[in-house]
Amino acid sequence: PVALQAQEFDASQGVTWQDMNDDAVDVVLDHIATVDARASAIETAAGLDDLNRAFIEPAAAALAEKINRDGLKLYQDIPYVVGTGGTAPSSLSDLSDVRRALNLNRAPLTGRVAVWDAEADAKLTQLPAVVNAEKAGSAEALREGSLGRVYGIDHYMSQGVWKHACGLTAAEAVKVSDAVSEGATKLSIDGTKLTGRLVRGDVLKIGGRSYVVTEDSAAAASNAIGGVSVYPALPALADNAEVTVVGGHTANLAFHPMAFAYVTRPLANPD
C-alpha cells in the first residue's frame, strides 16, 4: 500500500509534496498444481454424478489441500517467533504473546488470523476463559470445539500446519564469528560444537531479535558455518555476539491476510 507521512504545515515554506508510490512485486507463475488420475473407457462412460463422486470432488479436495499446505509453508519466510519450540501453546499468556508480536510488527488490527495444529488447538480449546460461556460470552468453544475470536484474532485449526526440523544436529555456545556491518544479510557463526547445516526456515535469535535463514547453508566444518543468509537485515554485530538457534518446532502461524498473496491465472488454451 501507499505510505504517506503527516507533517506540521509551515506557512513560510508552503506545501511539501509527497510521491504516491504504490510498490509492486514481480511474481513468477511457475507452479502448476495438478491431479492426474487414470480411468478406463467404461469408467469414463459413467454418468455425470458418478464422475463427480469418483473424480471431480476428490480432485478438488486434493487441490485445496495442496494449496493450503503450500500457503502454510510460507512460515519459512517469517522471522518473528514466540513461544518455546516443541511445547504446544496452552495459556492465555501464549495468545497474548502472539498478539504482542503482531502489534510490534504493526499488523493491522482488523482481520488478524491464527492457524494452529491439532495439538495446539486441543490445548487452547480447554482454556476456562474460552470454554466458560460466562467468561467468553459464548459456548461455541465447548459446543463446536472452535476457539473463535480471542484477543482480536480469529483462530482456526488445520492439519496442514508444518513441523519444522532444524538442520543442525548439534549447537553449543554458538556465536557470531566475525563482526557484521549494519544492513548485512549474511553472517558467519561458530560454536564449541556445531554440526549439520542451517536450512531454510531455521530461526536465529541475536540481541533480542530473531532472524530467519533464507536458504540452506553449507555444512558445518570445524564447528563453523560461513555465509549464512538471513532476513531481515542485520544491525551491526560484534564478533562473539551470542546466537540462539531455535530448535525443531511446529510452525503455527498468526498473521494478517495482506501479508501473503495467492496469485493465479487461467491456463493457456491448447492449440
For every predicted segment, state its role.
Residues 1-32:
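Assembly/oligomerization interface modules of large self-assembling protein complexes
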Residues 2-4, 41, 159:
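Beta-strand elements of well-folded, non-transmembrane domains
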Residues 27-94, 103-120, 143-156, 200:
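Long, contiguous amphipathic alpha-helices that act as assembly "spine/axial" helices in icosahedral shell
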Residues 89, 123-239:
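Autoprocessing Asn-cyclization modules and mimics
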Residues 94-96, 185:
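Short linear interaction motifs
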Residues 96, 101-105, 239-243:
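A contiguous pocket-lining binding segment that forms or flanks enzyme active sites
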Residues 224-271:
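Glycine- and charge-enriched low-complexity intrinsically disordered segments
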